Amino acid sequence: MVKFIDAKIDNFAKQLQQRNNLDRIEYLKMRLGMQVVVNNFFKTIVIYGVSLLCHMFLYTLTVHLTFFFIRHFAHGAHAKNSLLCYIQSVIYFVLLPWIVGYVQVSSLIMYTLALVGLIIISIYAPSATKKQPIPERLRRGKKIKAICLTLIFLLISLFLNEPYQQLMLLGIVIISILQFPIFFPKEDY
């Protein structure tokens, strides 16, 4: 199935290359972009499919949106391969929300962890990788935006009821953990 999809992407990219008179580098960039979109599409189906089966859709969505918006500016560690990404995503966005939502983790614990997360984001964000470097001229702006978004989510969470309050805070905790340099190979930082 994966080879079939990859072959279709390759054929489509070649057609676009010929039609638009693109060089090899532009073709490879376009092909990679299509692969990322397709991979993210399938990952989304898996994560939200599992969350629907577990009756956790809104829990998953709350954590994922908080995580996604902060990650846009904070960046952070990525899984080493696609399989690990699927596994980590199910853990982050289905298992952990289940634990926080159904085991009823206290607000005090979650706010403490989220405030520690804010400090971590303030220190380490944005976290660049070898595959996704961040130009020096963008670093300061991304750091400020990541901190501001984290503060906004902390404020919004004050007005939410349990478990959504804790789930929003969980998104902050997850993205902050992915900022630590220990999750990057030596050549990445």
From Swiss-Prot:
UniProt key word tRNA-binding: no
Pfam families: AgrB
Enzyme Commission number: 3.4.-.-
Membrane topology, record value: Multi-pass membrane protein
TM region(s), chain numbering: 50-70, 83-103, 105-125, 143-163, 164-184
GO cellular component terms given for this protein: plasma membrane
Enzyme class per UniProt: hydrolase
GO terms classed as biological process: proteolysis; quorum sensing
Subcellular location: Cell membrane
Keywords, in A-Z order: Cell membrane, Hydrolase, Membrane, Protease, Quorum sensing, Transmembrane, Transmembrane helix, Virulence
InterPro entries named in the record: AgrB
GO molecular function, one term: peptidase activity
Protein task: Essential for the production of a quorum sensing system signal molecule, the autoinducing peptide (AIP). This quorum sensing system is responsible for the regulation of the expression of virulence factor genes. Involved in the proteolytic processing of AgrD, the precursor of AIP.
Family the UniProt entry places it in: Belongs to the AgrB family.
UniProt name for this protein: Accessory gene regulator protein B
Protein species of origin: Staphylococcus saprophyticus subsp. saprophyticus (strain ATCC 15305 / DSM 20229 / NCIMB 8711 / NCTC 7292 / S-41)
Highest classification ranks of the organism: Bacteria, Bacillati, Bacillota, Bacilli, Bacillales
